[in-house]
Amino acid sequence: MGSIKGRFAVFANFDYRAGAPPAVSFGNRGGCPTIKQRAQSFVSEFQFGGEFVWWPSPELIAKSNLQQFINKHGLGSYDELMTRSTTDIAWFWNSVLQDLDIQFHKPYSRVVDLSKGKPWAKWCADGQMNIVHNMLDKYAGTPTDNNPAIKSETENGTVSLLTYKELREQVDRMANSLRSLGLGKGHAIGVFMPMVPEIVVAMLAIIKIGAIFLPLFSGFGAAAIASRLNDADAKALFTAAGTYRRGKFCAMKLIADEAAAQIPTLQHVVVLNQASEWLIEDLRRDAKPPATLSGPFDDSPTERTSAEDPMMIIYTSGTTGRPKGAVHTHCGFPIKSAQDMWQGLDLHADETLFWMTDMGWMMGPWEVFGTLLLGATMMLYDGAPDFPEPDRVWSLVDRHKVTALGVSPTLIRALRRYGDEIVHRHDLSSLRKFASTGEPWNPEPWTWLFQNVGRGKLPIINYSGGTEISGGILMGNVLTPMKPCAFSGPLPGMAADVVDENGNSVRGQVGELVIREPWIGMTRGFWKDPDRYIQTYWSRFPDVWVHGDWAAVDNDGLWYILGRSDDTIKVAGKRVGPAEVESVLVAHSQVSEAAAVGIPDPIKGEALVCFCVLKKDVNGDPSLATELKASVARDLGKALAPKEIIFVGDIPKTRNAKVMRRIVRAAYLGEKLGDTSALENPASLDDIKRAAG
């Protein structure tokens, strides 16, 4: 398949209700979005058809899970699969459930029930199924039982391994203990722990007894924990004595205790102490002192639950008001996770997946559900990715023979500054693929990962979706050739589209990313807040999910995400997405990371202020700032030249490496920061505040 060099002149001053899209160009930067100004009318020339840089081999295609699914179901091509999977959703998701060997206590009577409308689709109607049965119980007595389920390493170098059998035994014991405390079906139980094997034990024990798992970001403060657990009327909380970050002990139990005092419904705290022993604290009046976990080692029966019983609530960060709790069921999030891993990432049972994440973000539960449903191995790491040496990630891949490495663009930008030598000192031959999520790519770090780490041989499977999606809307795969920064397209079963302000499909221009049909992983709504769910996703076009991302499709059918539609900056009437500005900045040889925000300007309406992290041993000075301003003006047009370039030591990010532009802007303007509970590196705000004076 060759590249197509078609060009389309498109005016950029659309009037979208949620703000007009940024103007972009594909092709000159290897398929990644950039912006060009065309004379005074600000016409953007869309150049589609960047060069393909990776092609799958015939052997890889033949062995791939996706091709085998196509063959098994008598489909003539990938395109035929995409058409049928989005027009006959009952057939597709029934096929996925069967091919993944999802076992039900009671079979479902219908795959999907749309009687209450698309926003309230119900799946596996009348079926009974507890997902833990399919993750652990069904492997008992099979060869999978002796395979590794979890490999793990902590920052101090402690390494451990649990087989499927060992994990099941630990989950059974914990489930027995929880039942002895009176906990069971429908009770909400929070988990505030580091990424160690015990967090998986806690998660699966909660789900096994029919309770509701509430994952919490390990960097939360007491107020953030309390607000979420109060919203869910939580009965219990798992926590740990603490964890280490960059060699420093971070106490978690003290934070949990402070939160527990603010949660009237909380009755028990289950603590993993520094000796890796479980202690149970009873918070009720006249309770006994903490006791060690005393559940019997006997098998624990898995609770028979409805396939649509709530199984997990993941709270997404907001700026005001009560937190949004996305509700997920036994037949929802786990199935979507496994499908994405199986058909998109092409993960096989003999593989080890390592994704740098936290259980408080959707990629944590996603990794657990997907790997165990596929009979594969997850790799957990609790620690900083560049401590005690900047090669920590590459050493983990080497030591644990990781085959699929999940990263974020921010992580790669940070690691790239240390150079190539630290990568090449390790044996990375076990790697078969990369995967990436969290934010749009810039071309330079994508190319560095592809060429310098993957040596131009390994695909980078781009992945974009969200917590309420249960995984991906768009994803790469191993059937289609790849361009830098692009997606192969929507995942099978995801009826995604790019639309204009009237909801009409568009190609050759930027539009809103939408989904036209329900899918099995779709959140069942926000906990105790159905109106907010409808307003957030379903209120703009009838029966259409509007995701809040700018997207585009090129002439070769590859898709691109250009950032959040509510991040758009408008300078003197000209609209630009922060990712486009940041791509120009990180293309400079001395810049590692960048964040662009718009601030009020009395003349232009908004002005660009850009924050840059420089590479190692580079000192920022006025001449470099001037050079960077000139680069943006040259690439994007003089009207979009930044008002200021500010050099900082770090940029505020979440644990899953999303840049928190809202907080960057608020800190610079001296405004209230709002919800900062998801912030991984609060010290990064100091440089921004100092720059603001």
Regions found by a protein language model. Name each.
Residues 146-148, 271, 284-287, 292-315, ...:
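Conserved pre-ATP/AMP-binding loop-to-beta segment of ANL
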Residues 194, 236-255, 276, 382-386, ...:
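Adenylate-forming
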Residues 204, 208-290, 408:
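Structural core segment of the AMP-binding/adenylate-forming
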Residues 334-352, 362-404, 418:
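Conserved AMP-binding/adenylation subdomain of ANL enzymes
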Residues 66-67, 71-73, 135-163, 273, ...:
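AMP-dependent adenylate-forming
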Residues 216-242, 398, 405, 517-519, ...:
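AMP-binding/adenylate-forming catalytic core of the ANL superfamily
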Residues 80-84, 132, 146, 150-204, ...:
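Conserved AMP-binding/adenylate-forming core of the ANL superfamily
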Residues 381, 398, 432-434, 440-558, ...:
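Conserved AMP-binding/adenylate-forming
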